[in-house]
A protein has these predicted regions:
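Conserved CoA-thioester-binding segment of acyl-CoA-metabolizing enzymes
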Residues: 1-78, 113, 291-302
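Short, histidine-centered active-site or binding-site loop motifs used for metal coordination
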Residues: 36-40, 95, 126, 199
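Glycine- (often His-adjacent) and acidic-residue-rich active-site loop
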Residues: 41, 45-52, 69, 77-113, ...
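Crotonase-fold acyl-CoA enzyme core
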Residues: 113-229, 260, 264-268, 274
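C-terminal long alpha-helix characteristic of the crotonase
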Residues: 145-150, 201-249, 255, 259-261, ...
Length: 302
């Protein structure tokens, strides 16, 4: 994915100087570009949500909301795709360390609510794989644009945990409960073209058109009435806020799963590049069973 035309250097102003994993670029008319990229010199690699990236993805929307010079934000990935899944070392730390698990739960909650409550409109530009924490911002964005060949994947059940994060709060609203259950429970990939067809994203375009379209939309939003646009976003996002209890439940169940046996098998299978085997785990094993026919008959005679 080529760099956006006309972009400025990384923003080092007071709002964004502390960001390390996210690259920030200011554009004319109040457009801020947020770029997720690989670590170190390998910027073209998929952006993996390690501990630092996860923290920054949750925090950036508060700073954008406070930034008087930003009217609209674009979030995109660098290199081969939009975003990779969570860093496996972070997943293992969550599985073994309660403090880490509690911290990441709080960040996961904040990421969803901070995107929803950010008063500035957000445009996402997704290409290649779109997975993990980056996908949260990608699908919760006010205008979501994907290439037709993008691969949107909610990988929670493949890892061995419930589909938390943004899944329960936005998938049923965007594409309906039947499609949401199909893709979330089976961990099936969705192409950008199919995502547009079912209503999961706003637009699907050919890859060369992705950034030009994202900036075209952003410029229109930046040039429009800011009170009208922001108040429209606020009102529409009450649909998402009303799903808050479902989201909180899904996130709690997801993070309860990080303390269970399935996530260890999920991590091992990803490291070994094989299908997971969850056959040995059954959370309902050992539950009280109904009485036998003989016992039931005896109860009726007494």
């Amino acid at each position: 994915m080529s760099h956006a035309p006309g972009s400025n250097e990384h923003s080092n102003d007071a709002y964004y100087a502390h960001y390390q994993s996210l690259q920030l670029h200011r554009h004319p008319h109040g457009v801020l570009e947020v770029v997720m990229s690989g670590e170190g010199a390998n910027r073209s690699a998929l952006a993996t949500a390690n501990a630092r990236m996860h923290f920054e993805l949750a925090e950036i929307w508060r700073d954008i909301d406070r930034d008087p010079d930003t009217r609209v934000a674009i979030i995109r990935g660098e290199g081969k795709g939009f975003s990779a899944g969570g860093d496996l070392q972070l997943v293992e730390d969550m599985a073994t360390d309660f403090d880490v698990r509690a911290r990441v739960w709080r960040e996961a909650r904040d990421l969803v609510y901070n995107v929803i409550n950010c008063s500035k409109p957000i445009v996402s530009a997704m290409h290649g794989p779109a997975v993990g924490a980056g996908l949260v911002a990608g699908l919760l964005a006010d205008i979501s644009i994907a290439t037709k060949t993008a691969r949107i994947i909610d990988g929670h059940t493949r890892l061995g945990v419930a589909a938390g994060d943004h899944a329960a709060i936005v998938w049923p609203l965007l594409c309906g409960m039947a499609k949401a259950k199909y893709y979330l429970m089976l961990c099936e990939p969705v192409s950008g073209e199919e995502a547009e067809r079912i209503g999961l994203v706003s637009l699907a375009v050919d890859e060369p058109e992705l950034l030009p379209k994202a900036f075209e939309v952003a410029q229109k939003l930046a040039n429009g009435s800011q009170t009208a646009i922001r108040w429209t976003k606020y009102a529409l996002n009450n649909w998402l806020r009303s799903a808050g209890p479902a989201f909180d439940t899904s996130l709690a169940l997801e993070f309860m799963g990080f303390a269970g046996p399935d996530v260890r098998e999920g991590v091992n299978s990803l490291r070994e590049r094989r299908a997971p085997d969850f056959g040995a785990s059954d959370p309902w094993r050992g539950q009280p069973q109904p009485p036998s026919d003989d016992r039931a008959a005896g109860d009726e005679r007494s």
